[in-house]
Amino acid sequence: NSELLADNWHTNPISNFSLNQLRTRQMNAYNGEAGGLWNDGYRAINMANIVLYHLPEHQEQNIEKAILLEGECLFIRAICHFEILRMFSQAAGFTNDNSHLGIPIRISIGSATEEQNTPRASVEQVYNQIIDDLEKSILLLPENKNERVSKWAAMAYLCKVYFQKNDFQNALYWCDAIIESNQFSLNTNIDEIYSLSGWNYSNESIFQMINIPQDMSNGTPVSYTHLTLPT
């Protein structure tokens, strides 16, 4: 949905009513796309918090797997807060100190009532939590590039977070860290960016989801094909 706000998608005002509301920043409380982002995002955050809460009880069984799970859960919690924040709050810089309202921060398990009553934190507080989770995940995630999240993905998201926060010095720092790692290179054939899929990774890919044919069943990939513009 953040791609809509960046004008990387076309929307049809008639057939893509909910998406068009997001693109023009005229959505209401009944917008299904926005509601889905909020509900699914916080559902993922809650699942990550549950794993993090119970992880100490089982980490002795397999310490390496426990470290990996902790890193992955911190990464998921961070990027979900980040994407929700970008959709439901004013951007960083709206106030000089980013004290304007952001979204609720959820980093622990609570009852449904407690979660519903969680107040909105400031944008600065949300960004600080996101950055803290990502920095911790970098220390826990592996360097290998496969279908699971790696430290490079956490670094790449830190680039995006700092850039969105208008902290360009730190954004540049993490961009340089990825570039200087020599783990990634630009594709010589630009068509490979769109033609390579599944286990056949693009050299440029830092973090991607692995899809199987059954993932086409909900029609979402078709929608992306029609809506996304190359940038």
Roles of regions detected by a PLM:
Residues 172-229:
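Hydrophobic-face positions in mid-chain alpha helices that act as interaction patches
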Residues 14-88, 121, 136-142:
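Conserved, well-structured interaction surfaces
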Residues 87-128:
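Short coil/linker segments at helix-helix boundaries
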Residues 1-4:
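Acidic, glycine-rich segments characteristic of secretory precursors and extracytoplasmic regions
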Residues 101, 150, 157, 202-205:
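Residues that flank catalytic or metal-binding motifs in active/ligand-binding sites
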